[in-house]
Amino acid sequence: MKAVVCTPGQKDSVRVIDMERPRCGPGEVLVRVHSIGVDGTDEEINEGLYGEAPEGCDFLVIGHEAVGIVEESGAGVRCTRPGDVVVATVRRPCPERCLNCRNHQPDFCLTGDYLERGIKGLHGFMAEYYTESMDYVIQLPRELLDTGSLLEPLSVVEKGIRESLRVQQRMLWEPRRALVLGAGPLGLLATFILRDMGLDVYTLATRERTSPKARVAEVSGARYIDVGEEPLDTLPEKHGPFDIIVEATGYSPYAFRAMELVNRNGVVCLAGLSPKKKDHALCTDCINMSMVLDNKAALGTVSASRRDFEKGVDRMLSIRNKWPGLLESLFTKKESLDSAPRALRRTKEDIKAVVVAT
């Protein structure tokens, strides 16, 4: 079968190779891949900045945002059958089986020794087929086949917002207005989720208000703001207060500024990564005073557990019902497996690249 691989630590190593098709073992399903989303992690692996090959292998099959169709079920599998649409979760428990991994929450792994499909120590899904234990397979309705690769990134945001709401159970809290920083895939999915929850949502990004990203955000009823026209610091007075802010750019000054700008008793959810490790000048006293005196909270979120994937399925159906075609509009670049390396070279106008395997 065809598979898209990288050599971790080696820049621009992405390539298509032939591999033996995996065989389905007991308790597993063989999945024929339909499509795979491409994200920044895949690009960073190809840049040699990240990624870990499976033990005994010098390459890594990339891709962790895949939807496919069950082709074969192994012995003991009773909850799925050939023809079912499925998505596999990404993170696997650490070998030490820490408390959270034993509790089916490897996204909160205590040791950091977890494995991740297509990222850390396990081959991913950017291939014609993969096998997976039923413990990590989520079923989707057939109508989500063409957008199912969005479930994994959506589950990450779903988790972050769920955890933010859980933190806010510390008091009586009725959020009305949200600010999302960033209009990449995570930012737009956060916009959709918060709009689906009934909040007034403002999405701030660098592209012009006539850009595809702006149009997609506004289809959901959000207000798109070009940061070149309205800087972040001006937004609370003009459009706020913001009860929840989701930071999805990875630009760390925004993360810390959000802690100052969020409403009294509000919460900031940090979903963007900052891999460049740059130093920035900040008024740390200002941030601390604001957080303490106004009872604010901030939390980070990464990966997701099974319940977030399952909630994500319901969320995608709700978004699909309210705004038909909205999820599909995120796919602005499509490639085949043979041309998959091109999917890792996105422009600033691209929202989401997807590799269509079948």
Curated annotation (Swiss-Prot):
It comes from Methanocella paludicola (strain DSM 17711 / JCM 13418 / NBRC 101707 / SANAE). Gene3D superfamilies: Medium-chain alcohol dehydrogenases, catalytic domain, NAD(P)-binding Rossmann-like Domain. NADP(+) binds at A183, G184, P185, L186. This is Glucose 1-dehydrogenase. Its EC number is 1.1.1.47. It catalyses: D-glucose + NAD(+) = D-glucono-1,5-lactone + NADH + H(+); D-glucose + NADP(+) = D-glucono-1,5-lactone + NADPH + H(+). The keyword Membrane does not apply. InterPro entries: ADH-like_N (IPR013154), ADH_Zn_CS (IPR002328), Glc_1-DH_arc (IPR026583), Glu_dehyd_C (IPR031640), GroES-like_sf (IPR011032), NAD(P)-bd_dom_sf (IPR036291). Keywords: Carbohydrate metabolism, Metal-binding, NAD, NADP, Nucleotide-binding, Oxidoreductase, Zinc. It comes from the Archaea. One of its GO terms (molecular function) is D-glucose binding.
